[in-house]
């Protein structure tokens, strides 16, 4: 699920819930200090458990991503990119995360691949498809 504020609480029991940091803050009525790097894991865990999500995946813009999936927590820093346009980045992230999850990837692999894909589409103007060969090359560089 890639939620918006209007229907933020409509997805109890979802396998993976993916707000960005702004959506999480607004949806939960929090201020920025509640979502600092130190406070984020506890906030995510509490919300994940209250909504009975298997996983909660937060995109953090220039800070990367944070994922709490089942019993594993993963923080992945952003990769340095020349950002042209963020349109479609969230859709790319949830699409890659869903595919990786369906393929049996670990939470760390899901977070890393989705983070890479979201960053790659931000290098182009407008909403663009992710180029699979480019994602594969970037992912190969992680080893």
Model feature map: region roles:
Residues 76:
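Hydrophobic residues at beta-strand termini and immediately following loops
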Residues 46, 51-54, 79-142:
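Conserved post-catalytic alpha-helical subdomain immediately downstream of the catalytic base
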Residues 60, 142-143:
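C-terminal catalytic "cap/lid" subdomain
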Residues 1-73:
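Conserved phosphate/ATP/ADP-binding segment of small-molecule kinases
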